[in-house]
């Protein structure tokens, strides 16, 4: 049976601290629960999870859906997207089965790249390598979380860019339901011997296709994260501050 590889490449930088990281971890578990209930997915889908911050690590190598065990997502400083791309391409070379005269290889892999900010390393060489050797060999869906995403860089990787700004429990639930439905639809179609576009229609209350990357550029003014170091133990720690909006009464806020 030919495999359908699915890679989750997840930004676990300090800006994801708190509920966003928890919701992302729960979302991956939600996807796997849906996949395990589908006979087509159980036969074809193989899943890998790669986390990146200042370093990149494979948390789960490419495994069958029924054997997948959801890992705890780490948290780190920095967002090395270039290193994450290099790591992903190395994983492709190491684990994907190519079609030869003797054997049919894997179906076209699907990659879900989730990031909420700007790269903190140089991406040019990784992007060049990606476009030259890998971009046509897989479907990369880049998802920008929040309102401070570098969509210009993501556009250099793929035309499939999704903006997801509702980083609450309900928003994450809808988002990962969309991923589940997309993977299930693709696994069923290849079960019938046909590959289709894994991008299903979006629920535009939560998700939007990004066409004009310049218009979506921005900086999150409602959150700031600091990296500190303990003076006693000399160990790093993170501090995240969210702006709490204070709404004044009409009388106070009226223009005089």
Regions found by a protein language model. Give the residues of each.
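Von Willebrand factor A/integrin I-like adhesion domains
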Residues: 147-207
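Short cysteine/histidine-rich zinc-coordinating motifs and their immediately flanking basic loops
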Residues: 240-248
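Arginine/glycine-rich "motif VI" loop of SF2 helicases in the C-terminal RecA-like domain
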Residues: 39-40, 131-138
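Short, flexible, mixed-charge glycine/proline-rich loop motifs
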Residues: 214-225
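Short cysteine-rich clusters marking metal-coordination/redox-active sites
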Residues: 227-233
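Von Willebrand factor
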Residues: 1-60, 67-107, 110-114, 121-122, ...
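Cys/His-rich microdomains that often coordinate metals
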Residues: 234-239
């Amino acid at each position: 049976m030919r495999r359908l590889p699915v890679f989750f490449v997840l930004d676990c930088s300090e800006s994801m601290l708190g509920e966003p990281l928890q919701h992302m971890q729960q979302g991956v578990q939600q996807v796997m629960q849906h996949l395990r209930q589908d006979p087509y997915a159980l036969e074809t889908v193989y899943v890998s999870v790669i986390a990146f911050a200042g370093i990149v690590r494979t948390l789960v190598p490419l495994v069958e859906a029924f054997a997948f065990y959801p890992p705890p997502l780490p948290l780190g400083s920095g967002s090395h997207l270039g290193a994450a791309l290099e790591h992903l391409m190395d994983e492709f070379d190491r684990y994907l089965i190519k079609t030869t005269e003797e054997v049919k290889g894997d179906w076209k892999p699907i990659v879900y790249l989730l990031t909420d900010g700007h790269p903190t390393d140089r991406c040019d060489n990784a992007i060049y390598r990606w476009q030259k050797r890998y971009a046509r060999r897989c479907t990369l869906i880049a998802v920008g979380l929040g309102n401070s995403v570098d969509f210009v860089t993501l556009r250099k990787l793929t035309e499939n860019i999704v903006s997801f700004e509702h980083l609450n429990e309900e928003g994450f639930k809808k988002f990962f339901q969309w991923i589940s439905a997309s993977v299930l639809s693709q696994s069923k179609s290849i079960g019938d011997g046909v590959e289709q576009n894994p991008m299903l229609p979006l629920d535009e209350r939560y998700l939007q296709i990004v066409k004009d990357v310049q218009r979506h550029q921005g900086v999150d003014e409602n959150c700031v994260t600091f990296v500190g170091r303990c003076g006693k133990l000399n160990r790093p720690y993170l501090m995240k501050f969210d702006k709490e909006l204070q709404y004044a009464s009409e009388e106070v806020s009226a223009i005089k």
